[in-house]
Design a protein with these regions (language model features):
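Asp-box/BNR beta-propeller blade signature and adjacent active/binding-site loops
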Residues: 6-47, 51-393
């Protein structure tokens, strides 16, 4: 199979499809996130009597399993499939975060230096629609709340979930979401989970206006035991409206954030920022932003989520997302060699419908892309593609 890229032609891509809509007890699968396990590097506190065989890395593909329909509310579980052969085949489906018949969603997994996998996510009542939450018609107990759980055995079993809403969600915030896609652990050990929220409206506004969309991130300096808010980017002028956000640590230690910009929903006569992406940098591990989010017109996309991955050999920052500015289609990987300032297309998957995605480093020679796609619509499957690193350089 031959795939066209922005600069080269790749003939070694391998695809698999871990999730098909309408199968395995779920009407729809949405919101992919993917990580790979790794050997712990943190100090071992107990003596090891005999040599330990290092297990091969395991890929963990998460998404929302939507039981009754493709709607963003309702009975939704976070489900997982594991691959021990680099994404060529996948094990059985596991429901790893359930909220009864209510919602558990927006998976934000991150693999720590200890080998532990954190899964930050949100929970809400099944009937809490986005519109009702934005309008303030949902009581806090039924609204979007934040939880975390972990696995110490490469995703085979999971701890009970622990609520952290009080540590990371301010009173008055209405909508709330983590990532979607993987979170990151910085070289300092800090865990950074991008998020977004909405503010309560003023005047005669209803709360559904895009100008109330805002960005923030969650931070943990003790490997997920306790949490705090990092930067909070709130500006209701309607120019940049931060939504779903992804992050990567750059080689110089700065954190780069890239967000879906919902400025297209701003109402005249407010000026609209160019394009549908915005970005920002942090020089203090996500605690603050050097500047607020500003437009990133170098990434041509529709209004949609995207994913980031920083490679270190070579030093390239990757972005995945649809490249058709008017439709969720044309899944493409773009690359930046200057920390997100400029971008170029490097690898086009195909011209089919496509939407949300997540990137992962599979091994030294391979990047993985987990993405929503289909022949007649972007939400028919969640597919995994192995991409040679050489196709991105």
């Amino acid at each position: 199979m031959t795939e066209t890229t922005g600069t080269t032609t790749a003939t070694t891509a391998v695809t698999s499809t871990p999730f098909h809509a309408g199968r395995e007890g779920y009407a729809s699968f949405r919101i992919p996130a993917v990580v790979t396990t790794r050997t712990p590097t943190a100090p071992v506190t107990t003596p090891v009597a005999t040599p330990v065989t290092t297990p091969a890395p395991t890929l963990l593909a998460f998404c929302e399993g939507r039981v009754d329909s493709a709607a963003d509310h309702g009975h939704i579980d976070i489900v997982l499939k594991r691959s021990t052969d680099g994404g060529r085949t996948w094990g059985p489906l596991q429901a790893v975060a359930r909220n009864g018949n209510d919602l558990a969603g927006n998976p934000a997994p991150v693999v720590l230096d200890t080998g532990r996998i954190l899964l930050v996510h949100v929970r809400a009542a099944a009937g809490a629609t986005e519109d009702a939450i934005l309008r303030g018609r949902v009581k806090p107990a039924d609204g979007r709340r934040v939880w975390v759980q972990h696995s110490d055995d490469a995703g085979v079993t999971w701890s009970a979930p622990k609520e952290i809403t009080g540590q990371v969600k301010k009173a008055g915030w209405r909508w709330y979401a983590t990532t979607p896609g993987h979170a990151v652990q910085l070289g300092t050990g800090r865990v950074v989970v991008p998020g977004n929220h909405t503010l309560p409206p003023t005047g005669t506004d209803t709360g559904t206006e895009a100008k109330y969309n805002s960005g923030h991130c969650l931070l943990s300096d003790d490997r997920g035991e306790t949490w705090s808010l990092g930067y909070v980017d709130e500006n209701t002028d309607g120019y940049v409206n931060a939504n779903e956000t992804t992050a990567a640590e750059l080689p110089d230690g700065r954190v780069y954030f890239n967000t879906r910009n919902d400025t297209g929903r701003s109402r005249p006569p407010r000026p609209q920022s160019p394009g549908n992406r915005a970005d920002a940098h942090s020089a203090d591990g996500g605690r603050t932003l050097v500047k607020p989010f500003r437009p990133q017109a170098g990434l041509v996309t529709p209004v949609v989520q995207g994913s980031l991955l920083q490679l270190r050999d070579p030093d390239l920052l990757l972005y995945s997302g649809p490249a058709d500015p008017a439709a969720r289609a044309l899944m493409t990987v773009r690359v930046s060699a200057d920390g997100g300032t400029t971008w170029r297309p490097a690898y086009t998957v195909d011209g089919l419908p496509a939407a949300y995605s997540d990137l992962v480093r599979v091994d030294g020679a391979t990047v993985g892309l987990l993405y929503e796609t289909g022949d007649f619509g972007p939400y028919e499957t969640i597919t995994f593609r192995r991409i040679p690193v050489t196709a991105l350089t």
